[in-house]
Amino acid sequence: MPKIDVLLHGFPFRTDQGIPGFCSSLLITGEKKTLVDVGHVGRRLALQQALQERGLAYDDIDVTVMSHAHWDHSQNFDLFTKTPMLVHPWERKYAQHPHPNDWATPAWSGAMVEFQPDIVEVEEGYEIEPGVRIIHTPGHSPGSITVLVDTDDGVCAVTGDVLHYANVALTKTNPLVFWNERDAEKSISRILDEADVIYPGHDRSFRLVNGEIEYLEPMNLTFAGVHPDAPGVKFDTTPRPPWVMPGVEDQTVESLG
């Protein structure tokens, strides 16, 4: 059966100076090697190292998947120009003309998507290989897709930001909505109904056991260049309220063109 290997872990932390945006990059290995999300340029060398540690070069990847076109998940696809890139047609269209309030999809996003020479538009039910399939899970963005993988651990969902981090499985609320709030809630519920194990966009893999989060891997993160006791360094564990982009109510599938 296919297996999932975490190349880069996602992390949900922010700072008062901006968003690091470290997303998960997952390698699904079965009949093909499928890479889901590639991160931003700040993790370019880390992605290269993760592949090298597994004896892989960029051209060894058979398929890449763009869960959605936000900057933190998609800037390194140019490393894989010899590999087909799967993207939902709604996401591809939206990237050409993003909403002006959408800070996660800059105006250059469309050019970044179209830079790939082999774009494959995929919709609900597309099968990458037996046991690895695409479902359409909109809300966070119009064309967000999740990869469902049949593994020895059950059905695993590689979600991108349909489900940012583990706590979303409890709140059932997407913390960042750029497309449609109701769709986002429905997509979260669908993943929770269909998946045994979840690989979120910005957290470690987990499962729900009796309504509690059970992480499958320990936290492993090192901060360099700053001392925890340095004056002005603070840690804030206050939960962040969810954010819905102003203007989402004006967006429709027809408006994508």
Each language-model region and where it sits:
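Metallo-beta-lactamase
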Residues: P89-H136, P142-E217, L221, H227
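Active-site flanking residues adjacent to catalytic metal/cofactor-binding acidic residues
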Residues: V36, S67, V87-H88, V158-D161, ...
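Active-site HxH/HxHxD metal-binding segment of metal-dependent hydrolases
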Residues: G39-Q116, D229-T238
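Hydrophobic/aromatic beta-strand patches that form the interior of the parallel beta-sheet core
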Residues: D5-L7, V65, L86, V120, ...
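Short, flexible loop segments at the rims of nucleotide/cofactor-binding pockets, characterized by
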Residues: F11-Q17, H40-R43, D62-T64, I134-T137, ...
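Conserved beta-strand hairpin/beta-sheet module of binuclear metal-dependent hydrolase folds
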Residues: P2-E53, T146-H164
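Zn-dependent metallo-beta-lactamase
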Residues: M1-E31, K186, L192-E194, G211-L216, ...
